[in-house]
């Protein structure tokens, strides 16, 4: 049969018959024009509307949520890729007769929009935003916020047309926008619910901080692709031990800008440390594994001890004469060797010296360990990473832009053993790509491990609830559950505030400066009911800065007049609440 088919096909080719079976293809096809013609035909015949409503009466329901696309620029290829998957998924269930909600979402608020508007305006600093209208901060912020709104409206229209060109079938006249009043007030409702459960709190922490945007970057925003391979200067510093002649702690750091904040040196109590004498006669404490790597064959071991034996030793630092350092020099643990907690700050023996520079105000692990051991803290940088007053000649100079000022000082004062280049993965701001620093600041959080208040028996924590919910889901592929549970296990408390920014959710937190009580309002009606001034100026405007901040309420504890905290919300609140506004009307019973 195969041979017969082959002979028949060959005879058709020779006779020219096969050529007549196919239409001639044009060599120069205008695909964009072809797309437009097809789209016009679909609109003329009402094909899209028929597709969207074909299962309107079906009892079968497939619930689909469109995670909102950021409408800040034209779509990229990754958006087209994701939207194609979404479209295929919905088409599959539509063909099977399920009723669906074909609602597109636009993610409108946040730093990503602010940065692009700053570029359009040709400005580079926060203070430039506040002077868009010369000498009028409130009018400047209002102008900036309106420019942000205009940008996202412009690109939401562009992305809508691009999506239609993809053949993406959605109810394009019914998209949801995260900047809408409904979405913002829904987040207020969510945050009030969290507060009622006892999960909202304000506290200090060492957070990743963007010195250009002058705001904190949450764990959720530190994306893998925003870690860069960078080369920085690292330093091995020699810290002289008090009361011991020519005996030093050898300590390595890849962030020299943090050295003025040094409080202690951490060691692992279970590791073996040795005192190595150089040919010069100077002696240095390092881990046993580091001797050959650091000293080669020239170093001679003269003493050996467990790390636990070194704890309590005191040393001198290179910045001890600075006013800010002198202020805390009387603390009993200042400039001392401390035991690490390996669950907080594990110490490596494969690089460095095994003795870890601990700057409580300038590192996440440092802060956590310092909190556990009751260490003092020296704040060294301002929001823009300039060194603060109280740091002598360094004050006013930028810690990240001028690391050489610290390295030069270390060399001149005899505290530098070796300075060398070090290449490592270092995080950058996900929006402006500036290298991050770590800074201790007070922020607002949702607690992951506080038991729920006002419930019968012992309340569950948010972490427990989320893990239980994750295990109820049918994950495709299956390994998704394992990844999700691992993420939930290690997730820190959720940083929900952004200091010093403008375009975003106005956090509904009113903090009394007199009695420290804070309250979380749950929506527009509650705000109107509680307002003691400013409602007339705010009414009719969107719940954004600076308009929302006209409204003041009375503290329920001491009756003081209270303003809203100046922070905006973390942008992940906006998309995270997307499940609710399209389906839930805020009524008392809800």
Describe the predicted segments one by one.
Residues 21-280, 359-372, 376-391, 413-461, ...:
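N-terminal, positively charged nucleic-acid-binding surface of large information/translation enzymes
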């Amino acid at each position: 049969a195969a041979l017969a088919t082959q002979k028949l096909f060959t005879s058709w080719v020779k006779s020219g018959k096969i050529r007549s079976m196919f239409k001639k293809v044009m060599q120069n096809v205008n695909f964009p024009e072809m797309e437009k013609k097809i789209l016009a035909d679909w609109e003329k015949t009402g094909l899209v509307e028929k597709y969207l409503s074909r299962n309107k009466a079906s009892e079968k329901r497939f619930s689909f949520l469109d995670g909102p696309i950021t409408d800040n620029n034209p779509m990229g290829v990754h958006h087209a890729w994701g939207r194609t998957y979404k479209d295929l998924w919905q088409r599959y269930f539509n063909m099977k007769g399920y009723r669906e909600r074909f609602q597109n979402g636009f993610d409108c608020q946040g730093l990503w929009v602010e940065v692009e508007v700053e570029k359009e305006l040709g400005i580079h600093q926060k203070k430039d935003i506040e002077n868009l209208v010369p000498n009028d901060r409130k009018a400047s912020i209002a102008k900036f916020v309106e420019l942000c709104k205009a940008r996202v409206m412009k690109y939401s229209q562009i992305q809508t047309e691009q999506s239609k060109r993809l053949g993406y079938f959605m109810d394009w006249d019914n998209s949801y926008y995260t900047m809408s009043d409904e979405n913002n007030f829904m987040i207020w409702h969510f945050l009030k619910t969290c507060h009622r459960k006892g999960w909202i709190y304000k506290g200090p922490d060492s957070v990743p901080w963007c010195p250009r945007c002058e705001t904190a970057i949450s764990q959720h925003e530190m994306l893998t692709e925003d870690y860069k391979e960078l080369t920085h200067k690292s330093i091995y510093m020699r810290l002289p031990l008090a009361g011991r002649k020519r005996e030093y702690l050898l300590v390595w750091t890849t962030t020299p800008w943090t050295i003025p904040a040094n409080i202690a040196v951490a060691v692992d109590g279970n590791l073996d440390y040795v005192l190595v004498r150089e040919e010069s006669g100077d002696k240095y404490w390092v881990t046993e594994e580091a001797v050959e790597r650091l000293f080669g064959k020239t170093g001679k071991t003269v003493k050996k001890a467990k790390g636990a034996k070194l704890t309590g030793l005191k040393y001198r630092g290179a910045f001890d004469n600075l006013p800010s350092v002198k202020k805390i020099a009387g603390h009993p643990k200042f400039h001392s060797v401390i035991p690490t907690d390996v669950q907080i700050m594990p110490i490596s023996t494969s690089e460095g010296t095994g003795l870890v520079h601990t700057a409580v105000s300038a590192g996440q692990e440092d802060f956590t360990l310092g909190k556990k051991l009751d260490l003092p803290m020296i704040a060294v940088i301002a929001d823009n990473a300039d060194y603060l007053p109280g740091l002598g000649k360094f004050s006013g100079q930028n810690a990240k832009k001028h690391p050489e000022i610290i390295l030069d000082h270390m060399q001149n004062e005899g505290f530098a053993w070796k300075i060398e280049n070090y290449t490592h993965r270092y995080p950058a701001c996900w929006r402006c790509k500036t290298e991050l620093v770590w800074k201790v600041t007070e922020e607002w959080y949702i607690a992951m491990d506080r038991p729920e208040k006002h419930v019968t028996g012992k309340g569950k924590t948010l972490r427990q609830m989320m893990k239980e919910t994750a295990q109820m889901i049918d994950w495709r592929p299956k390994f998704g559950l394992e990844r999700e549970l691992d993420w939930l296990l290690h997730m820190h408390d959720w940083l929900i505030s952004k200091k010093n920014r403008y375009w975003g959710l106005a956090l509904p937190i009113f903090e009394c400066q007199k009695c420290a009580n804070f309250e979380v309002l749950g929506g527009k009606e509650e705000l109107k009911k509680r307002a003691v001034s400013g409602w007339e100026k705010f009414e009719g405007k969107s719940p954004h800065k600076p308009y929302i901040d006209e409204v003041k309420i009375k503290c329920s504890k001491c009756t003081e007049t209270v303003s809203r905290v100046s922070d905006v919300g973390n942008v992940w609140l906006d998309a995270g609440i997307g499940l609710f506004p399209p389906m839930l009307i805020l009524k008392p019973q809800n």
